[in-house]
Amino acid sequence: IVTPQEAKDIIQLQIADLNITEPKNLEEQALSLVGRDVYEKLIKGYTEKQWGRDCKDLPAFIIKRLPVRLTFDNNYFNALYQGIPMGGYTKMVENLLEGIEVRLNTDYLENKKELDALAKKVVYTGPIDAYFDYELGYLEYRSVRFETETLDKPNFQGNAAVNYTDKETPWTRIIEHKWFEFGKDENGEELPKTIISREYSSEWKPGEEPYYPVNNEKNAALYARYKEMAEKENIITGSVHAAIYEFVSSAFLKDF
């Protein structure tokens, strides 16, 4: 393959040969979008490593679309304007919280009565099953663990994020943080060292931080029951991964 059109033709041929009209699982959904070669080289191993499950056992709706570009554009998003806050998100949040009381290492559920009395409305961003003390059982989540190290070199991988799509490599990706701001400090000077973080995906266990929900029929049914309980308590679902049990940016609002 030497031209973008040749690559496009092969992908379309593979999709046509598979003839998957109604994908029953994630594997069939991916095959129907990008064909077998791209799926097996870039999607299958990474996805099974991320979710800890065979692609055939994951629902099709997890992959709504797979952006395929036959160019050197390696951005995932298509927005015309993209960026991150100067100094990073920590600095942005610090500025947002200026003048606001912040309590760290405080569990809302363990101090619920006291904290509820502080405001007319409380935004709860924890797991919905934890809110109800796991009365109906545990929802399943995936968790993420980071191993971070400082290297005595100016450049490790030359890019902010590199995904490892094979199943054998234990981490899903390596983040080299300096490249989010072009490898320079706040004065525009080159940084002589670099910090990297290896990201590992794992099954969530109580006491760990839940990162994203495992969307399958069993969990969907259990979440529906928790959601019904929340509605009876006049809890309005908003947009946080755990609170509304969806892989989105979310929040959970309780109206008193």
Where do the protein language model's features map onto the residues?
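Conserved beta-strand scaffold positions in the cores of enzyme catalytic domains, especially
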Residues: 102, 122, 195-197, 235-238
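Conserved beta-strand termini and adjacent loop/short-helix elements that scaffold enzyme active sites
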Residues: 105-107, 177, 239
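Mid-domain catalytic core of redox enzymes
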Residues: 109-229
